[in-house]
Protein backbone atom coordinates (compact mmCIF):
# COMPACT_ATOMS: atom_id res chain seq x y z
CA UNK A 1 0.00 0.00 0.00
CA UNK A 2 1.32 3.48 -0.90
CA UNK A 3 2.20 5.74 2.01
CA UNK A 4 -0.34 8.49 2.68
CA UNK A 5 1.27 11.77 1.62
CA UNK A 6 0.42 15.24 2.96
CA UNK A 7 -1.09 16.19 -0.40
CA UNK A 8 -3.53 13.27 -0.09
CA UNK A 9 -4.82 14.30 3.34
CA UNK A 10 -7.94 16.29 4.11
CA UNK A 11 -6.70 18.68 6.77
CA UNK A 12 -8.08 21.82 8.34
CA UNK A 13 -5.66 24.79 8.48
CA UNK A 14 -4.84 24.21 12.15
CA UNK A 15 -4.40 20.48 11.57
CA UNK A 16 -1.74 21.11 8.94
CA UNK A 17 0.48 22.83 11.50
CA UNK A 18 0.40 19.78 13.76
CA UNK A 19 0.33 17.15 11.04
CA UNK A 20 4.07 16.38 11.16
CA UNK A 21 3.96 15.98 14.94
CA UNK A 22 0.87 13.76 14.78
CA UNK A 23 2.38 11.54 12.05
CA UNK A 24 5.57 11.11 14.08
CA UNK A 25 3.48 10.25 17.12
CA UNK A 26 1.50 7.65 15.13
CA UNK A 27 4.69 6.10 13.73
CA UNK A 28 6.10 5.85 17.25
CA UNK A 29 3.09 3.85 18.43
CA UNK A 30 3.32 1.56 15.40
CA UNK A 31 6.96 0.76 16.08
CA UNK A 32 7.89 -2.65 17.51
CA UNK A 33 10.33 -0.89 19.84
CA UNK A 34 7.47 1.09 21.42
CA UNK A 35 6.04 -2.02 23.07
CA UNK A 36 9.42 -2.75 24.64
CA UNK A 37 9.87 0.83 25.82
CA UNK A 38 6.37 0.93 27.34
CA UNK A 39 6.93 -2.39 29.10
CA UNK A 40 10.31 -1.23 30.41
CA UNK A 41 8.90 2.07 31.70
CA UNK A 42 6.10 0.22 33.51
CA UNK A 43 8.61 -2.11 35.19
CA UNK A 44 10.88 0.79 36.18
CA UNK A 45 7.90 2.70 37.61
CA UNK A 46 6.91 -0.35 39.67
CA UNK A 47 10.45 -0.75 41.03
CA UNK A 48 10.77 2.95 41.88
CA UNK A 49 7.41 3.11 43.66
CA UNK A 50 8.01 -0.18 45.51
CA UNK A 51 11.23 1.27 46.93
CA UNK A 52 9.86 4.71 47.80
CA UNK A 53 7.65 6.16 50.53
CA UNK A 54 4.66 5.18 48.37
CA UNK A 55 5.35 1.43 48.63
CA UNK A 56 2.36 0.87 50.93
CA UNK A 57 0.05 2.51 48.41
CA UNK A 58 1.51 0.29 45.68
CA UNK A 59 0.69 -2.83 47.73
CA UNK A 60 -2.80 -1.53 48.48
CA UNK A 61 -3.50 -0.96 44.79
CA UNK A 62 -2.26 -4.44 43.92
CA UNK A 63 -4.51 -6.08 46.53
CA UNK A 64 -7.52 -3.81 46.01
CA UNK A 65 -10.66 -5.93 45.55
CA UNK A 66 -12.83 -5.61 42.44
CA UNK A 67 -16.19 -7.36 42.19
CA UNK A 68 -18.64 -8.26 39.43
CA UNK A 69 -22.19 -9.20 40.42
CA UNK A 70 -25.29 -10.13 38.46
CA UNK A 71 -28.27 -11.12 40.59
CA UNK A 72 -27.17 -13.90 42.92
CA UNK A 73 -23.95 -14.38 40.98
CA UNK A 74 -20.88 -12.54 42.25
CA UNK A 75 -17.15 -12.83 41.71
CA UNK A 76 -14.56 -10.82 43.63
CA UNK A 77 -10.77 -10.80 43.29
CA UNK A 78 -7.85 -8.50 43.91
CA UNK A 79 -6.54 -6.30 41.10
CA UNK A 80 -3.45 -8.53 40.98
CA UNK A 81 -5.62 -11.61 40.36
CA UNK A 82 -7.81 -9.84 37.77
CA UNK A 83 -4.70 -8.83 35.84
CA UNK A 84 -2.91 -12.19 36.04
CA UNK A 85 -5.94 -14.44 35.58
CA UNK A 86 -8.13 -12.09 33.53
CA UNK A 87 -6.38 -9.52 31.35
CA UNK A 88 -3.47 -11.84 30.62
CA UNK A 89 -5.90 -14.26 28.97
CA UNK A 90 -5.96 -11.81 26.03
CA UNK A 91 -2.17 -11.97 25.84
CA UNK A 92 -2.30 -15.77 25.76
CA UNK A 93 -5.12 -15.62 23.19
CA UNK A 94 -2.92 -13.47 20.94
CA UNK A 95 -0.04 -15.87 21.58
CA UNK A 96 -2.31 -18.75 20.56
CA UNK A 97 -3.18 -16.97 17.31
CA UNK A 98 0.54 -16.56 16.59
CA UNK A 99 1.23 -20.22 17.30
CA UNK A 100 -1.63 -21.39 15.08
CA UNK A 101 -0.58 -19.09 12.24
CA UNK A 102 3.09 -20.09 12.41
CA UNK A 103 2.21 -23.80 12.43
CA UNK A 104 -0.19 -23.50 9.48
CA UNK A 105 1.53 -21.11 7.08
CA UNK A 106 4.44 -19.49 8.91
CA UNK A 107 8.01 -20.35 9.84
CA UNK A 108 6.97 -23.54 11.68
CA UNK A 109 5.01 -25.03 8.77
CA UNK A 110 7.89 -26.85 7.08
CA UNK A 111 9.86 -29.12 9.41
CA UNK A 112 13.08 -28.64 7.45
CA UNK A 113 12.89 -24.89 7.96
CA UNK A 114 11.55 -25.06 11.51
CA UNK A 115 13.88 -27.79 12.78
CA UNK A 116 16.62 -25.27 13.64
CA UNK A 117 14.21 -23.12 15.66
CA UNK A 118 12.82 -26.20 17.42
CA UNK A 119 16.34 -27.41 18.27
CA UNK A 120 17.29 -23.95 19.56
CA UNK A 121 14.12 -23.78 21.65
CA UNK A 122 14.69 -27.22 23.17
CA UNK A 123 18.22 -26.24 24.17
CA UNK A 124 16.95 -22.88 25.40
CA UNK A 125 14.47 -24.61 27.70
CA UNK A 126 16.42 -27.65 28.94
CA UNK A 127 19.69 -25.92 29.85
CA UNK A 128 18.13 -23.01 31.80
CA UNK A 129 15.83 -25.38 33.69
CA UNK A 130 18.77 -27.70 34.41
CA UNK A 131 21.07 -24.90 35.60
CA UNK A 132 18.38 -23.46 37.84
CA UNK A 133 17.56 -26.87 39.31
CA UNK A 134 21.24 -27.55 39.97
CA UNK A 135 21.62 -24.26 41.85
CA UNK A 136 18.27 -24.57 43.66
CA UNK A 137 19.12 -28.03 45.01
CA UNK A 138 21.66 -26.37 47.29
CA UNK A 139 18.92 -24.30 48.97
CA UNK A 140 15.52 -24.86 50.55
CA UNK A 141 13.13 -27.39 49.01
CA UNK A 142 10.63 -24.70 47.94
CA UNK A 143 13.29 -23.05 45.77
CA UNK A 144 13.06 -25.92 43.28
CA UNK A 145 9.51 -24.83 42.35
CA UNK A 146 10.99 -22.04 40.25
CA UNK A 147 12.67 -24.31 37.68
CA UNK A 148 10.30 -23.15 34.92
CA UNK A 149 11.04 -19.43 35.38
CA UNK A 150 14.06 -19.08 33.03
CA UNK A 151 12.60 -21.16 30.18
CA UNK A 152 10.61 -18.54 28.24
CA UNK A 153 11.62 -15.58 26.05
CA UNK A 154 9.90 -12.20 26.17
CA UNK A 155 8.95 -11.61 22.53
CA UNK A 156 8.11 -7.91 22.95
CA UNK A 157 11.38 -7.01 24.64
CA UNK A 158 13.63 -9.14 22.44
CA UNK A 159 12.11 -7.99 19.13
CA UNK A 160 12.04 -4.43 20.40
CA UNK A 161 15.80 -4.55 20.94
CA UNK A 162 16.28 -5.87 17.40
CA UNK A 163 14.11 -3.05 16.08
CA UNK A 164 16.29 -0.50 17.87
CA UNK A 165 19.41 -2.11 16.39
CA UNK A 166 18.09 -1.47 12.88
CA UNK A 167 20.52 -2.52 10.13
CA UNK A 168 22.97 -3.93 12.68
CA UNK A 169 20.71 -6.98 12.95
CA UNK A 170 19.95 -8.95 9.75
CA UNK A 171 16.33 -9.21 8.68
CA UNK A 172 16.32 -12.98 9.22
CA UNK A 173 17.33 -12.46 12.87
CA UNK A 174 13.91 -11.02 13.73
CA UNK A 175 12.12 -13.89 11.97
CA UNK A 176 14.26 -16.51 13.73
CA UNK A 177 13.94 -14.87 17.15
CA UNK A 178 10.18 -14.49 16.74
CA UNK A 179 9.76 -18.19 15.84
CA UNK A 180 12.11 -19.18 18.68
CA UNK A 181 10.11 -17.13 21.18
CA UNK A 182 6.86 -18.72 20.00
CA UNK A 183 8.22 -22.27 20.47
CA UNK A 184 9.63 -21.20 23.84
CA UNK A 185 6.23 -19.87 24.85
CA UNK A 186 4.59 -23.13 23.73
CA UNK A 187 6.92 -24.95 26.11
CA UNK A 188 6.21 -22.46 28.90
CA UNK A 189 2.44 -22.86 28.44
CA UNK A 190 2.84 -26.65 28.64
CA UNK A 191 4.92 -26.27 31.81
CA UNK A 192 2.27 -24.04 33.40
CA UNK A 193 -0.51 -26.50 32.55
CA UNK A 194 1.35 -29.66 33.59
CA UNK A 195 3.53 -28.64 36.52
CA UNK A 196 2.00 -25.50 38.05
CA UNK A 197 -1.53 -26.85 38.37
CA UNK A 198 -2.36 -28.39 41.75
CA UNK A 199 -6.02 -29.25 42.39
CA UNK A 200 -8.13 -30.36 39.42
CA UNK A 201 -11.94 -30.24 39.51
CA UNK A 202 -13.05 -32.71 36.86
CA UNK A 203 -16.62 -31.42 36.54
CA UNK A 204 -15.48 -27.91 35.63
CA UNK A 205 -12.81 -29.39 33.37
CA UNK A 206 -15.51 -31.40 31.58
CA UNK A 207 -17.61 -28.25 31.04
CA UNK A 208 -14.50 -26.51 29.71
CA UNK A 209 -13.97 -29.37 27.27
CA UNK A 210 -17.58 -29.18 26.08
CA UNK A 211 -17.29 -25.41 25.61
CA UNK A 212 -14.07 -25.81 23.63
CA UNK A 213 -15.79 -28.45 21.51
CA UNK A 214 -18.59 -25.96 20.88
CA UNK A 215 -16.06 -23.36 19.69
CA UNK A 216 -14.54 -25.83 17.26
CA UNK A 217 -18.06 -26.73 16.07
CA UNK A 218 -18.74 -23.04 15.36
CA UNK A 219 -15.58 -22.98 13.25
CA UNK A 220 -16.52 -26.11 11.31
CA UNK A 221 -20.06 -24.84 10.70
CA UNK A 222 -18.72 -21.62 9.21
CA UNK A 223 -19.50 -19.06 11.93
CA UNK A 224 -17.13 -16.09 11.58
CA UNK A 225 -18.65 -13.35 13.75
CA UNK A 226 -16.52 -12.43 16.80
CA UNK A 227 -19.50 -12.34 19.21
CA UNK A 228 -19.90 -16.14 19.12
CA UNK A 229 -16.26 -16.72 19.98
CA UNK A 230 -16.28 -13.93 22.58
CA UNK A 231 -19.17 -15.49 24.49
CA UNK A 232 -17.70 -18.97 24.12
CA UNK A 233 -14.28 -17.70 25.19
CA UNK A 234 -15.67 -16.10 28.36
CA UNK A 235 -17.48 -19.33 29.26
CA UNK A 236 -14.31 -21.31 28.57
CA UNK A 237 -12.29 -18.93 30.78
CA UNK A 238 -14.78 -19.32 33.63
CA UNK A 239 -14.82 -23.13 33.52
CA UNK A 240 -11.02 -23.34 33.23
CA UNK A 241 -10.69 -20.94 36.18
CA UNK A 242 -12.99 -23.13 38.27
CA UNK A 243 -11.24 -26.35 37.21
CA UNK A 244 -7.94 -25.51 38.91
CA UNK A 245 -5.99 -25.26 35.64
CA UNK A 246 -4.59 -21.75 35.28
CA UNK A 247 -7.16 -19.55 33.60
CA UNK A 248 -4.76 -18.26 30.94
CA UNK A 249 -4.84 -21.70 29.32
CA UNK A 250 -8.31 -20.70 28.12
CA UNK A 251 -6.71 -18.03 25.93
CA UNK A 252 -4.48 -20.52 24.13
CA UNK A 253 -7.30 -23.06 23.71
CA UNK A 254 -9.81 -20.49 22.41
CA UNK A 255 -7.27 -19.25 19.86
CA UNK A 256 -6.94 -22.75 18.42
CA UNK A 257 -10.65 -22.66 17.51
CA UNK A 258 -10.45 -19.33 15.63
CA UNK A 259 -11.31 -19.72 11.91
CA UNK A 260 -8.47 -19.50 9.41
CA UNK A 261 -10.61 -19.21 6.27
CA UNK A 262 -12.45 -16.11 5.03
CA UNK A 263 -16.05 -15.96 3.86
CA UNK A 264 -15.12 -15.17 0.26
CA UNK A 265 -12.40 -16.04 -2.22
CA UNK A 266 -9.89 -13.54 -3.58
CA UNK A 267 -11.51 -13.53 -7.04
CA UNK A 268 -14.81 -12.41 -5.48
CA UNK A 269 -12.90 -9.69 -3.63
CA UNK A 270 -11.23 -8.42 -6.82
CA UNK A 271 -14.48 -8.35 -8.81
CA UNK A 272 -16.56 -6.60 -6.17
CA UNK A 273 -13.85 -4.19 -5.04
CA UNK A 274 -13.24 -3.16 -8.65
CA UNK A 275 -16.96 -2.50 -9.08
CA UNK A 276 -17.11 -0.37 -5.92
CA UNK A 277 -13.98 1.54 -6.93
CA UNK A 278 -15.35 2.29 -10.41
CA UNK A 279 -18.62 3.58 -8.96
CA UNK A 280 -16.72 5.66 -6.41
CA UNK A 281 -14.55 7.31 -9.07
CA UNK A 282 -17.54 7.91 -11.33
CA UNK A 283 -19.70 9.54 -8.64
CA UNK A 284 -16.98 11.43 -6.77
CA UNK A 285 -17.43 15.21 -6.71
CA UNK A 286 -14.10 16.89 -6.11
CA UNK A 287 -15.74 20.08 -4.87
CA UNK A 288 -17.44 18.31 -1.95
CA UNK A 289 -16.16 16.35 1.02
CA UNK A 290 -17.24 12.78 1.64
CA UNK A 291 -19.36 14.06 4.54
CA UNK A 292 -21.56 15.76 1.94
CA UNK A 293 -21.74 12.68 -0.31
CA UNK A 294 -23.77 10.00 1.44
CA UNK A 295 -23.63 7.64 -1.54
CA UNK A 296 -19.82 7.82 -1.50
CA UNK A 297 -19.77 7.10 2.22
CA UNK A 298 -21.92 4.02 1.63
CA UNK A 299 -19.51 2.82 -1.07
CA UNK A 300 -16.59 3.14 1.35
CA UNK A 301 -18.54 1.07 3.90
CA UNK A 302 -19.20 -1.53 1.19
CA UNK A 303 -15.46 -1.67 0.50
CA UNK A 304 -14.81 -2.26 4.21
CA UNK A 305 -17.37 -5.08 4.28
CA UNK A 306 -15.85 -6.68 1.18
CA UNK A 307 -12.37 -6.51 2.73
CA UNK A 308 -13.63 -8.00 6.00
CA UNK A 309 -15.27 -10.92 4.17
CA UNK A 310 -12.05 -11.70 2.30
CA UNK A 311 -9.65 -11.57 5.26
CA UNK A 312 -9.28 -14.35 7.81
CA UNK A 313 -10.47 -13.95 11.41
CA UNK A 314 -7.13 -15.21 12.74
CA UNK A 315 -5.29 -12.31 11.05
CA UNK A 316 -7.99 -9.70 11.54
CA UNK A 317 -8.49 -10.39 15.24
CA UNK A 318 -4.75 -10.62 15.80
CA UNK A 319 -4.33 -7.20 14.19
CA UNK A 320 -7.05 -5.71 16.42
CA UNK A 321 -5.55 -7.13 19.63
CA UNK A 322 -1.87 -6.55 18.88
CA UNK A 323 -1.53 -2.91 19.98
CA UNK A 324 -3.88 -3.03 23.02
CA UNK A 325 -2.10 -6.11 24.36
CA UNK A 326 1.38 -4.68 23.73
CA UNK A 327 0.75 -1.12 24.91
CA UNK A 328 -1.89 -1.59 27.63
CA UNK A 329 -2.23 -5.12 29.01
CA UNK A 330 1.46 -6.09 29.20
CA UNK A 331 2.54 -2.77 30.80
CA UNK A 332 -0.26 -3.13 33.38
CA UNK A 333 0.93 -6.67 34.09
CA UNK A 334 4.52 -5.44 34.43
CA UNK A 335 3.52 -2.62 36.77
CA UNK A 336 1.49 -4.90 39.03
CA UNK A 337 4.05 -7.73 39.13
CA UNK A 338 7.52 -6.16 38.79
CA UNK A 339 7.50 -4.06 41.95
CA UNK A 340 9.77 -5.58 44.59
CA UNK A 341 11.51 -3.92 47.51
CA UNK A 342 15.30 -4.08 47.35
CA UNK A 343 17.07 -5.29 50.52
CA UNK A 344 18.98 -2.69 52.53
CA UNK A 345 22.15 -4.65 51.91
CA UNK A 346 22.16 -5.60 48.21
CA UNK A 347 25.08 -7.98 48.74
CA UNK A 348 22.75 -10.31 50.66
CA UNK A 349 20.81 -11.04 47.49
CA UNK A 350 23.81 -13.00 46.22
CA UNK A 351 23.24 -15.46 49.08
CA UNK A 352 19.87 -16.40 47.53
CA UNK A 353 19.91 -19.57 45.45
CA UNK A 354 16.70 -18.41 43.74
CA UNK A 355 18.29 -15.13 42.60
CA UNK A 356 21.53 -16.80 41.48
CA UNK A 357 19.66 -19.68 39.85
CA UNK A 358 17.27 -17.48 37.85
CA UNK A 359 19.86 -14.91 36.73
CA UNK A 360 22.51 -17.47 35.75
CA UNK A 361 19.98 -19.72 33.99
CA UNK A 362 18.56 -16.82 31.95
CA UNK A 363 22.02 -15.77 30.77
CA UNK A 364 24.28 -18.84 30.73
CA UNK A 365 21.52 -21.40 30.23
CA UNK A 366 19.99 -19.65 27.23
CA UNK A 367 23.32 -18.84 25.59
CA UNK A 368 24.81 -22.31 26.00
CA UNK A 369 21.60 -24.22 25.31
CA UNK A 370 20.53 -22.34 22.19
CA UNK A 371 24.02 -21.99 20.69
CA UNK A 372 25.10 -25.60 21.27
CA UNK A 373 21.83 -27.13 20.06
CA UNK A 374 21.86 -24.88 16.97
CA UNK A 375 25.47 -25.86 16.20
CA UNK A 376 24.68 -29.57 16.55
CA UNK A 377 21.54 -29.28 14.39
CA UNK A 378 23.41 -27.48 11.58
CA UNK A 379 26.63 -29.50 11.66
CA UNK A 380 24.71 -32.78 11.66
CA UNK A 381 22.90 -31.71 8.48
CA UNK A 382 19.58 -31.89 10.29
CA UNK A 383 18.97 -28.13 9.89
CA UNK A 384 20.31 -25.13 8.00
CA UNK A 385 20.96 -21.53 8.97
CA UNK A 386 18.51 -19.01 7.48
CA UNK A 387 19.75 -16.65 4.76
CA UNK A 388 21.66 -13.75 6.27
CA UNK A 389 22.40 -15.49 9.57
CA UNK A 390 25.85 -16.61 10.76
CA UNK A 391 26.73 -18.46 13.97
CA UNK A 392 27.80 -15.14 15.48
CA UNK A 393 24.25 -13.91 15.01
CA UNK A 394 22.91 -17.12 16.56
CA UNK A 395 25.08 -16.53 19.64
CA UNK A 396 23.81 -12.94 19.89
CA UNK A 397 20.21 -14.12 19.43
CA UNK A 398 20.75 -16.67 22.20
CA UNK A 399 21.67 -13.79 24.52
CA UNK A 400 18.55 -11.80 23.59
CA UNK A 401 16.47 -14.95 24.15
CA UNK A 402 17.57 -14.69 27.79
CA UNK A 403 15.29 -11.67 28.15
CA UNK A 404 12.37 -13.51 29.73
CA UNK A 405 10.55 -10.76 31.56
CA UNK A 406 6.79 -11.23 31.06
CA UNK A 407 6.41 -15.01 31.02
CA UNK A 408 9.12 -15.46 33.66
CA UNK A 409 7.31 -13.12 36.07
CA UNK A 410 4.11 -15.01 35.34
CA UNK A 411 5.63 -18.42 36.13
CA UNK A 412 7.35 -17.01 39.23
CA UNK A 413 4.00 -15.79 40.58
CA UNK A 414 2.63 -19.33 40.16
CA UNK A 415 5.65 -21.24 41.44
CA UNK A 416 6.20 -19.14 44.54
CA UNK A 417 2.59 -18.36 45.44
CA UNK A 418 2.51 -18.27 49.24
CA UNK A 419 6.27 -17.68 49.46
CA UNK A 420 6.69 -13.88 49.20
CA UNK A 421 10.41 -13.88 50.04
CA UNK A 422 11.25 -16.42 47.34
CA UNK A 423 9.00 -14.58 44.88
CA UNK A 424 10.84 -11.30 45.57
CA UNK A 425 14.19 -13.03 45.03
CA UNK A 426 12.93 -14.54 41.78
CA UNK A 427 11.72 -11.14 40.52
CA UNK A 428 15.12 -9.59 41.22
CA UNK A 429 16.78 -12.51 39.43
CA UNK A 430 14.48 -12.03 36.42
CA UNK A 431 15.24 -8.32 36.25
CA UNK A 432 19.00 -8.84 36.64
CA UNK A 433 19.14 -11.74 34.17
CA UNK A 434 17.04 -9.91 31.57
CA UNK A 435 19.15 -6.74 31.78
CA UNK A 436 22.45 -8.66 31.53
CA UNK A 437 21.18 -10.77 28.62
CA UNK A 438 19.91 -7.67 26.78
CA UNK A 439 23.21 -5.80 27.23
CA UNK A 440 25.35 -8.74 26.07
CA UNK A 441 23.10 -9.51 23.09
CA UNK A 442 22.98 -5.87 21.98
CA UNK A 443 26.76 -5.50 22.33
CA UNK A 444 27.38 -8.62 20.25
CA UNK A 445 25.13 -7.43 17.42
CA UNK A 446 26.95 -4.09 17.40
CA UNK A 447 30.32 -5.87 17.26
CA UNK A 448 29.47 -8.30 14.46
CA UNK A 449 30.75 -6.78 11.22
CA UNK A 450 30.69 -9.80 8.92
CA UNK A 451 27.76 -9.54 6.52
CA UNK A 452 26.17 -12.67 5.12
CA UNK A 453 24.38 -12.62 1.76
CA UNK A 454 20.69 -12.22 2.39
CA UNK A 455 18.12 -13.14 -0.23
CA UNK A 456 15.45 -10.47 -0.66
CA UNK A 457 11.99 -11.15 0.66
CA UNK A 458 8.79 -9.55 -0.48
CA UNK A 459 7.53 -9.12 3.04
CA UNK A 460 7.95 -10.26 6.56
CA UNK A 461 5.24 -11.10 9.01
CA UNK A 462 4.88 -10.35 12.65
CA UNK A 463 2.31 -11.51 15.17
CA UNK A 464 -0.50 -13.62 13.76
CA UNK A 465 0.75 -13.12 10.22
CA UNK A 466 0.36 -9.37 10.05
CA UNK A 467 2.53 -7.61 7.45
CA UNK A 468 5.60 -6.10 9.07
CA UNK A 469 7.48 -3.18 7.58
CA UNK A 470 10.95 -1.88 8.26
CA UNK A 471 9.47 0.64 10.68
CA UNK A 472 8.14 -2.18 12.78
Swiss-Prot record:
* Reported function: Na(+)/H(+) antiporter that extrudes sodium in exchange for external protons.
What the entry lists under PANTHER family is as follows: NA(+)_H(+) ANTIPORTER NHAA, SODIUM ION/PROTON ANTIPORTER NHAA-RELATED
Q: Where in the cell is it found?
A: Cell inner membrane
Q: Which UniProt keywords apply?
A: Antiport, Cell inner membrane, Cell membrane, Ion transport, Membrane, Sodium, Sodium transport, Transmembrane, Transmembrane helix, Transport
Query: Any stretches that span the bilayer, and where are they?
Result: 34-54, 86-106, 116-136, 146-166, 175-195, 203-223, 227-247, 324-344, 353-373, 394-414, 428-448
Hey, which family's this protein in? Belongs to the NhaA Na(+)/H(+) (TC 2.A.33) antiporter family.
User: What GO terms fall under cellular component here?
Assistant: plasma membrane
Which InterPro entries does its entry note?
Na/H_antiporter_dom_sf, NhaA
Question: A Gene Ontology molecular-function term?
Answer: sodium:proton antiporter activity
By what name is this protein known? Na(+)/H(+) antiporter NhaA 1
Pfam families xrefs = Na_H_antiport_1
Q: How does it sit in the membrane?
A: Multi-pass membrane protein
Q: Which domain of life is it from?
A: Bacteria
Q: What is its main location?
A: membrane
Q: Species name for this entry?
A: Pseudoalteromonas atlantica (strain T6c / ATCC BAA-1087)
